[in-house]
């Protein structure tokens, strides 16, 4: 039985955060990167402004040969990884945005809690918790794509694994313009369930924090409920696929099953991979993700 419960003021809290963010101009900047541009893919460094006026960096790739308006994919990073340059997605026919939320490389001048520490930074106060701005940084990535004349606004997808999988869930929930989503081994889903099921980092950061500050447990539980992907899941309306590893000791599969049950979309599919840990069957699953996005964003036949 999951411990995840949605706070009564969950919607009001995030509506207020969105109001604060919408009052801040996006101020997008797109800088050509000739060093990383090739014959078939144009590469740019992108910057835009997010909550608390923090500048967020991203890599932006687009096919040299493309339609006037092209489908787009936003890629979201894992907890300890920095965003890759998404040229392989551009070669598949998409415009691709690889976002570096606050604290990641090139987005860490104004906010840099480090790793480990992001997960517990201000964890006793939902109004200042690190993931409050971190989530908005990713949602503003969709806003950036919608601002680009070369992007087809009705064909935007989002994907990521681990932390990127959790961010895929929250982004699909909070940006209705997302047409399709693929979340792998989703982290940030079932926080308090996970800390009881695993003693592997990053979730172990929360156990460490509560051992040092035992009086904080109630405040920690209260805060993370507002950021738990499971509490966002019923807002998801777009087609979505989720893959989990049944031997995952980083993001326990129990949390993946709970998440999937709560997803509101009618078009949803869960892929559980036995014999796999936190990789969540990535090698086997990549072709499924490719077919899924090709069907929903490129109108190409394929089954996912």
Task: Please describe what each predicted stretch is.
Residues 246-251, 279:
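Acidic catalytic loop of the alpha/beta-hydrolase fold
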Residues 84-136, 193-194, 200:
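Cap/lid segment of the alpha/beta-hydrolase catalytic domain
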Residues 1-42, 301-304:
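N-terminal targeting or regulatory segments adjacent to alpha/beta-hydrolase or S9 domains
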Residues 58-62, 68-79:
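Short beta-strand element of the alpha/beta-hydrolase
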Residues 119-162:
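Gly/Ser-rich "nucleophile elbow"/oxyanion-hole loop immediately N-terminal to the catalytic nucleophile
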Residues 169-215, 272:
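Hydrolase active-site cap/lid region
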């Amino acid at each position: 039985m999951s411990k995840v419960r949605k706070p009564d003021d969950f919607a009001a809290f995030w509506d207020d955060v969105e109001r604060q963010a919408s009052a801040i101009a996006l101020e997008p900047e797109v800088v050509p990167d000739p060093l990383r541009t090739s014959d078939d893919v144009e590469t740019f460094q992108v910057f835009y402004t997010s909550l608390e006026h923090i500048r967020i960096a991203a890599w932006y790739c687009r096919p040299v040969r493309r339609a006037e308006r092209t489908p787009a994919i936003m890629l979201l990073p894992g907890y300890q990884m920095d965003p890759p340059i998404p040229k392989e997605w551009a070669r598949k026919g998409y415009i691709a945005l690889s976002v570096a939320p606050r604290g990641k490389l090139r987005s860490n001048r104004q906010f840099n809690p480090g790793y480990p520490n992001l997960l517990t930074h201000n964890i006793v106060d939902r109004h200042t918790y690190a993931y409050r701005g971190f989530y908005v940084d990713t949602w503003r990535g969709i806003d950036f794509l919608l601002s680009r004349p070369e992007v087809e606004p009705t064909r935007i997808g989002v994907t990521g694994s681990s932390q990127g999988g959790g961010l895929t869930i929250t982004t699909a929930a909070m940006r209705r313009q997302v047409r399709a989503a693929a979340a792998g081994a989703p982290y940030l889903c079932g926080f308090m369930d996970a800390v009881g099921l695993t003693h592997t980092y990053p979730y172990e950061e929360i156990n460490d924090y509560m051992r040092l500050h035992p009086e904080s447990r109630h405040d920690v539980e209260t805060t993370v409920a507002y950021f738990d992907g499971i509490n966002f899941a019923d807002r998801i309306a777009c087609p979505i696929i989720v893959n989990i590893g049944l031997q995952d000791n980083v993001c326990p599969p129990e949390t993946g099953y709970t998440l999937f049950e709560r997803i509101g979309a009618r078009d949803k599919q869960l892929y559980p991979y036995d014999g796999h840990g936190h990789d969540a069957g990535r090698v086997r699953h990549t072709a499924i993700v490719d077919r899924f996005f090709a069907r929903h964003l490129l109108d190409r036949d394929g089954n996912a």
